[in-house]
Regions:
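Pocket-edge structural micro-motifs
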Residues: 7, 44-45, 114, 206, ...
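Acidic, glycine-rich loop-and-beta core segments that form the ion-binding/anion-interacting portion
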Residues: 219-294
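Short beta-strand/loop segment at the start of cytosolic alpha/beta domains
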Residues: 22-25, 294
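Short, glycine/serine-rich, charged loops/turns that create anion-binding
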Residues: 10, 47, 86, 117, ...
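Hydrophobic beta-strand segments of well-ordered beta-sheets in folded domains
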Residues: 3, 38-42, 110, 200-202, ...
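Short acidic, S/G/P-rich loop/turn micro-motifs used as interaction or catalytic elements
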Residues: 46-52, 209-211, 236, 277
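N-terminal domain-start signal
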Residues: 20, 45-46
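Cap/lid and interdomain-hinge subdomains that line or gate substrate/regulatory clefts
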Residues: 1-3, 7, 14-17, 29-32, ...
Length: 294
């Protein structure tokens, strides 16, 4: 099973390790991803920084090259496509999966899983929260490009689709459903997932990794007979691929610094660009604990 993650900005790989992050998507580069030893690779599309039209063109180009590579090689393993998006609901959340479905589909369903457990960004009863605060009450909702007024993911997805999908056709997989879920054929939730078709849109509640693991195990069983697409934040990727991030020491990261011929560390440059308050706090902490000069 190979997981292909099309990432809308550079942070999607933060919960995994030991996989390729492709900065280009020509056919020869994509082939390296498919032939890599890892069951997972990322394509950095960076579409969150693009207009709707340019984002769609980029995703379409990536998809066409993916189809070319896949058709030219007889890959025996299942391929699962993941559109990695923001855990604070910014970005082209409907447009990008829609473009993927048009080019690589048709899919039986698209699952929306914006939970980022490490950042306390959770989906409960269909609404999204940051550290228990409804997402529409946070600074992220005031984004000048991707702002929104609701924490209800179903309502937001419908609004972002510009009525291309019916509100009633968007389904929820609630925590109570996941509690009941198992991979037995007679399980009522399992059967509901198995019967999804015509690219149903399903919003998945998540508040911890055990729920993600249970969902991921069922998906891996169903994927042999169903064709599913995913629009998710980073936590689902580590769950489904079983490649959780590895904690590293300060010595490990310091060894990544570039050295000169005498093996002394060369100076580096840190560029920070964000209006989010958390980034300001992180920058101030960096200036306090290091010899960085602004």
């Amino acid at each position: 099973m190979k997981f292909v993650v099309i990432d809308d900005d550079p942070t999607g790989s933060q919960t995994v390790h030991d996989c390729l992050l492709l900065l280009k998507w020509d056919c020869s580069t994509l082939l390296k991803g498919f032939e890599s030893n890892s069951n997972l690779f990322f394509i950095l599309a960076n579409t969150r920084s693009l207009s709707e039209n340019d984002a769609k063109l980029t995703i379409t180009e990536i998809c066409k090259n993916l189809k070319t590579v896949i058709s030219s090689k007889a890959f025996e393993e299942e391929i699962i496509f993941i559109s990695r998006g923001d855990s604070t609901l910014r970005g082209h959340n409907f447009l990008e999966p829609s473009a993927l479905n048009s080019c690589l589909g048709p899919f039986d369903a698209t699952f929306y899983i914006p939970a980022f457990i490490e950042g306390k960004r959770l989906t409960i009863n269909g609404s999204h929260f940051v550290d228990k605060i409804p997402i529409n009450q946070t600074i992220f909702a005031s984004d000048k490009i991707f702002g929104y007024e609701t924490s209800n993911v179903k309502k937001l997805l419908f609004q972002q689709s510009k009525s291309q999908i019916n509100f009633e056709d968007i389904q929820n997989l609630f925590l109570s459903d996941i509690e009941m879920l198992n991979d037995e054929e007679n399980n009522i939730v399992y059967k509901a997932l198995k019967n999804l078709n015509n690219n149903k849109h399903v919003i998945v509640d998540v508040e911890n990794y055990s729920q993600l693991k249970k969902f991921s195990l069922v998906i891996k069983k169903l994927i042999k007979q169903k064709k599913f697409l995913f629009r998710t934040a980073a936590s689902f990727i580590s769950s489904i691929s079983e490649k959780k991030s590895v904690s590293q020491s300060e010595i490990f990261f310091s060894n990544l610094r570039i050295r000169n011929k005498e093996k002394s560390f060369l100076p580096g440059l840190i560029i920070v660009g964000s209006y989010v308050e958390l980034s300001t706090i992180q920058l101030n902490n960096l200036l306090e604990i290091s010899n960085c000069n602004p």
